[in-house]
Amino acid sequence: MTKIKIVVIVGPTAVGKTALGISLAKAFNGEIISGDSQQVYRQLDVGTAKATQEEQAAAVHHLIDIREVTESYSAYEFVQDAQKAISDIVSRGKLPIIVGGTGLYLQSLLEGYHLGGQVDQEAVKAYRQELDQLSDQEVYELLQVKSITIKQLNRRRAIRALELSQFADDLENAETAYEPLIIGLNDDRQVIYDRINQRVDRMLENGLLEEAKWLYEHYPTVQASRGIGYKELFPYFVGEMTLAEASDQLKQNTRRFAKRQLTWFRNRMAVGFTAITAPDYPQVVHDRVRDFLGQKEKS
């Protein structure tokens, strides 16, 4: 079977994945698929670092704004949606370029997990509602009953593990249909941390506070509100923190998230990284893609 070539750009938040994706899309006749679990939500633009309207005009983007904030979204659904997007892009003679930082989503796609049959979404929803009625202790006890172990014990991870166990028969692990070129972006820790701090400041200047307040006032408990960028500002709205304190908390949590992303990509996906401050960084990446596609450099 001839595998479909795809380019996958990974790295910590704020490292510049979107800009590189657009650059590659322009150079290699590509279209971008968002691999970010938060960018699927409509009306959440600033806090999710969604590609701007100008950026989306520069290159076609898929899997952005495909869910309402009241809806949940899972790795299963991402794999389905990404497979459809890849098929669509390839059918038009273009290169699929996946850009994102949600490691579980990307790993699920690249390692060949797909839905063996149509998962009954109503059954998934009903099971999740059952779990929502349980206390934390009852959820953890259910993990033990099912002999499920997870590394970091918290309610959200526990429920995900229980759902995976419950619907495991609906999944197949098959040889992946894709040949990926994985491009990892990174740099010295302080460079990344400075970029994160600067981006949080820009987000606050560009409407993050208003976006977070709207989410807090209308949908404070939905899955989308748990993403980094929103929940850190909720204490400010009720007077438990000053804006400066909430901003610092957001920066700290984002830095921690970036560290977890890097750990995932190194340990789960064996990604090698390119320093974004290297003088030849853009050219090196473009050359890698050109070699991967078997293209000659234009004179």
UniProtKB/Swiss-Prot annotation:
Pfam families assigned to the protein according to its UniProt record, in alphabetical order: IPPT
GO terms for biological process, alphabetical: tRNA modification
Region (Interaction with substrate tRNA): 36-39
UniProt keywords, alphabetically: ATP-binding, Magnesium, Nucleotide-binding, Transferase, tRNA processing
Annotated catalysed reactions: adenosine(37) in tRNA + dimethylallyl diphosphate = N(6)-dimethylallyladenosine(37) in tRNA + diphosphate
Residues engaged in binding ATP: 11-18
Molecular function terms, GO-annotated: ATP binding; tRNA dimethylallyltransferase activity
EC nos: 2.5.1.75
Site positions for Interaction with substrate tRNA: 102
Family: Belongs to the IPP transferase family.
Name of the protein in its database record: tRNA dimethylallyltransferase
Natural source organism: Streptococcus pyogenes serotype M4 (strain MGAS10750)
Lineage, highest ranks first: Bacteria, Bacillati, Bacillota, Bacilli, Lactobacillales
